[in-house]
């Protein structure tokens, strides 16, 4: 029997607000343990939470970017469970009345695009962090993360392979980072994913028993964990067994999943409305104000780059992979007036330099205006492409502009026809045998004469001018 995987993802994105969702404590990562806490996020008696407006607006940004319906009214609920990193004994989340519902994102698959539905986007607070001591049985609790704002993005079970799930996750990550509402750092836990996966006979509409996968801290691990879990469930079903509904942890070092606990249902958490927080009313004017601040999203930008700049889809995908890189490329294209050359130089030499030093485009020592100026010098014939390779290295190393490097190194290309004619005449007179052979039909010697001219001018002669003059002068 052939089985079909059914996959849904729950993504938690930590929002880039300066303060927590219900108090004024800092959200900055890496501070001393328990230094960013107060009576509100520690769950002390007699204190009341106050909702951070920016959290709602960041959630609305993601909802708009993923074509969700933003509800006119949403409210918070208490999710009750015990864990050492949850000081109140409950987590403030949303349940019956989330921020937004019924959205979608499109992903690229082998045969085109596929639409993945979003069930909901809701706001909630993060829990603290347990730190386990490897040298003794103690565990320590750091509550700095308690109350840090999250949005949870819940997909429909629309994915049918681990590859589709990884593509969907990358698309969400790309949108969140483009919107500048989440830094997307999976290692620090600001972008986390849980996966629900089940198998069913191909062609059936009823879902199988699902397992939830946790502890996946990279796109690669999400794909590997799902691939393993699909094979594990298939082995069980083909052997006549039954899949147990449970939560499993991914073990990256062994490449397997391990049972963690039985899978909870919503009723296990005893959700009820939080009496300390009023409902949030979202007006059409508020939605419109947030919409006006939305940037162009990566998929739209990619399509525009192909359409308006005439660059290949692959190049457009690389150049729009991050908002700062896309902005840099567009400025180079504007400054140079040559979008295709701008694409080649940014994707080629510039990204190579940055990748070698593990630097971001924001830290690039060559400004977009300077790179555009370099491309203009090539297009004007002032320097050759070969010269430009040497010049851009010097620009990257020193931060100097292209004209400054050209002047300093005396690298201006020779385009004066009279001067080059004199050089060519001397070379032809010094090579009578090669000249005679060329004129008798050995056309390949043309390259020899080009090389001699470049050697005589130390590579400064304009190749196009040389070619034109040589053709005339060799013809006799």
From Swiss-Prot:
Gene Ontology biological process terms from the UniProt entry: glutaminyl-tRNAGln biosynthesis via transamidation; translation
Gene Ontology terms, MF aspect: asparaginyl-tRNA synthase (glutamine-hydrolyzing) activity; ATP binding; glutaminyl-tRNA synthase (glutamine-hydrolyzing) activity
Its EC number(s): 6.3.5.-
Span of the signal peptide: none
InterPro entries: Asn/Gln-tRNA_amidoTrfase_suB/E, Asn/Gln-tRNA_Trfase_suB/E_cat, Asn/Gln_amidotransferase, Asn/Gln_tRNA_amidoTrase-B-like, GatB, GatB_C_1, GatB_Yqey_C_2, Gln-tRNA_amidoTrfase_suB_CS
Top-level lineage group: Bacteria
Keywords: ATP-binding, Ligase, Nucleotide-binding, Protein biosynthesis
Catalysed conversion reaction: L-glutamyl-tRNA(Gln) + L-glutamine + ATP + H2O = L-glutaminyl-tRNA(Gln) + L-glutamate + ADP + phosphate + H(+); L-aspartyl-tRNA(Asn) + L-glutamine + ATP + H2O = L-asparaginyl-tRNA(Asn) + L-glutamate + ADP + phosphate + 2 H(+)
Pfam families for the chain: GatB_N (PF02934), GatB_Yqey (PF02637)
Top enzyme class: ligase
Quaternary structure, from the entry: Heterotrimer of A, B and C subunits.
Function statement: Allows the formation of correctly charged Asn-tRNA(Asn) or Gln-tRNA(Gln) through the transamidation of misacylated Asp-tRNA(Asn) or Glu-tRNA(Gln) in organisms which lack either or both of asparaginyl-tRNA or glutaminyl-tRNA synthetases. The reaction takes place in the presence of glutamine and ATP through an activated phospho-Asp-tRNA(Asn) or phospho-Glu-tRNA(Gln).
Name of the featured protein: Aspartyl/glutamyl-tRNA(Asn/Gln) amidotransferase subunit B 2
Taxonomic placement: Bacteria, Pseudomonadati, Thermodesulfobacteriota, Syntrophia, Syntrophales
């Amino acid at each position: 029997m052939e089985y079909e995987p059914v996959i849904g993802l729950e993504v938690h994105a930590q929002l880039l607000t300066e303060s927590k969702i219900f108090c004024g404590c800092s959200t900055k990562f890496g501070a001393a343990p328990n230094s960013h806490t107060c009576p509100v996020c520690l769950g002390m008696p007699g204190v009341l939470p106050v909702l951070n407006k920016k959290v709602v607006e960041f959630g609305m940004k993601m909802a708009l970017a993923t074509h969700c319906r933003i509800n006119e009214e949403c409210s918070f609920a208490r999710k009750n469970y015990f864990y050492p990193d949850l000081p109140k004994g409950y987590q403030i989340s949303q349940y019956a009345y989330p921020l937004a519902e019924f959205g979608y994102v499109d992903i690229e698959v082998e045969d085109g695009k596929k639409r993945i539905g979003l069930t909901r986007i809701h706001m909630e607070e993060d829990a603290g962090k347990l730190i386990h001591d490897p040298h003794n049985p103690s565990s320590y609790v750091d509550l700095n993360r308690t109350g840090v704002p999250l949005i949870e993005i819940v997909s429909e079970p629309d994915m049918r392979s681990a590859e589709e799930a990884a593509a969907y996750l990358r698309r969400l990550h790309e949108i969140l980072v483009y919107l500048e509402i989440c830094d997307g750092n999976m290692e620090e836990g600001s972008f986390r994913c849980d996966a629900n996966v089940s198998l069913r006979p191909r062609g059936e509409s009823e879902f199988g028993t699902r397992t939830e996968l946790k502890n996946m801290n990279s796109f690669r691990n999400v794909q590997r964990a799902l691939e393993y879990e699909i094979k594990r469930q298939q082995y069980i079903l083909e052997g006549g067994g039954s899949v147990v509904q449970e939560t499993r942890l991914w073990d990256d070092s062994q490449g397997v999943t391990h049972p963690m606990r039985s899978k909870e249902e919503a009723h296990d958490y005893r959700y009820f409305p939080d009496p300390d927080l009023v409902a949030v009313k979202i007006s059409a004017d508020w939605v419109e104000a947030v919409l006006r601040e939305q940037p162009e999203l990566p998929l739209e930008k990619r399509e525009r780059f192909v359409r308006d700049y005439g660059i290949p889809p692959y190049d457009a995908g690389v150049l729009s992979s991050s908002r700062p890189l896309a902005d840099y490329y567009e400025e180079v294209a504007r400054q140079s007036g040559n979008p295709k050359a701008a694409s080649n130089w940014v994707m080629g030499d510039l990204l190579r330099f940055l990748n070698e030093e593990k630097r971001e485009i924001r830290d690039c020592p060559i400004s977009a205006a300077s790179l555009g100026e370099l491309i203009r010098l090539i297009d004007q014939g002032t320097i050759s492409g070969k010269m430009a390779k040497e010049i851009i290295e010097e620009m990257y190393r020193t931060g100097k502009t292209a004209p400054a490097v050209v002047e300093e190194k005396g690298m201006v290309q020779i385009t004066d026809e009279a001067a080059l004619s004199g050089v060519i005449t001397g070379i032809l007179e010094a090579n009578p045998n090669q000249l005679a052979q060329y004129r008798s039909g050995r056309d390949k010697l043309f390259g020899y004469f080009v090389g001699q001219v470049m050697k005589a001018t130390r590579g400064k002669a304009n190749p196009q001018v040389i070619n034109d003059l040589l053709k005339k002068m060799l013809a006799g």
